[in-house]
A protein has these predicted regions:
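Short, basic/aromatic beta-hairpin or loop at an interaction surface
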Residues: 22-25
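Basic, tryptophan- and glycine-enriched interaction regions
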Residues: 176-203, 208-214
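Hydrophobic ligand-binding cavity/cleft-lining segments
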Residues: 145-187
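Single conserved hydrophobic/aromatic residue that forms the stacking wall/gate
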Residues: 221-230
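Rieske [2Fe-2S] iron-sulfur-binding domain
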Residues: 2-7, 11, 16-17, 30-153
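Flavin (primarily FAD) cofactor-binding/catalytic cores of flavoenzymes
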Residues: 217
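Phosphate/oxyanion-binding loops and surfaces in catalytic or ligand/nucleic-acid-binding neighborhoods
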Residues: 134, 175-178, 229
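Structured loops at beta-to-helix junctions and adjacent beta-edge loops in soluble globular domains
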Residues: 34, 130-132, 162-164, 171, ...
């Protein structure tokens, strides 16, 4: 028998959050743009988890669970002193590993006075965070060094869309619609024919070749011109 809640959504598009958290956590996720995280802590909601991002005294990025274990106040509402982030409620101090190192009202810290910490790496123009098992980190974030290469022009920002984020993810992953819906924009027909796939152990693999195609006028006129960075 299927769970009654699950049964209700069979054959329907499942609203975000209705069946719980099923994000792949043991992988790198973009947490923020590098230039967003400066001297003040910044709050993020990542994978249904409150996270606070900040920088240590030497500029190294850090990430903690954004709740003080005492009264669950958001640490992102506090401030940073040296390498410590200070809770805005009772002034408890936490290091980048999530351990409480000082509480103004008591001399000894209980072992339970700690919160989860997350590995953060700065690569390209982004901060990447590992939200899963911190002992299972077995790879580096994707190589996006071109984002800070002087031979490239990189633009960053946010674009708010009033829609379920799942729809955007599905659209980006679905490349088969490009030749039909965007035929006057991208002029790319490589995805009309399904590529051959093969099994390598437990991994399904395929190879796809793309022909060079000229950009449409709308993309040419809306793309930024190269800048002389010399």
């Amino acid at each position: 028998m299927k769970d009654s809640n699950e049964q209700k959504f069979i054959g329907q598009r499942i609203p975000n959050g209705m069946l719980g958290d099923n994000y792949p956590r043991n992988m790198w996720w973009v947490a923020a743009r590098s230039d967003e995280i400066k001297e003040k802590p910044v709050a993020r909601w990542l994978l249904e988890t409150p996270v606070v991002l900040y920088r240590l005294e030497d500029g190294t990025p850090a990430a903690l669970y954004d709740r003080c274990p005492h009264r669950w106040a958001p640490l992102s509402e506090g401030h940073v002193e040296g390498d410590k982030i200070i809770c805005p409620y009772h002034g408890m101090q936490f290091n980048s590993e999530g351990h409480c190192t000082k509480a103004p009202t008591q001399k000894m810290m209980p072992k339970t006075a700690q919160i989860p910490s997350f590995k953060v790496l700065e690569r390209g123009a982004f901060l990447w965070i590992w939200m899963g098992d911190q002992d299972a980190i077995d790879c580096e974030p994707p190589d996006v060094s071109y984002q800070t290469d002087n031979d490239w022009t990189f633009l960053g920002g946010y674009y708010d869309v009033k829609a379920n984020w799942v729809l955007i993810r599905e659209n980006v992953m679905d490349l088969t619609h490009i030749a039909f819906l965007h035929k006057n924009t991208f002029k790319q027909n490589d995805w009309i024919t399904a590529p051959d796939s093969y099994l390598d152990g437990e991994t399904i693999c395929y190879e796809q070749e793309f022909d060079l195609a000229p950009l449409s006028p709308c993309l040419l006129y809306t793309s930024p011109s190269p800048r002389d960075r010399g």
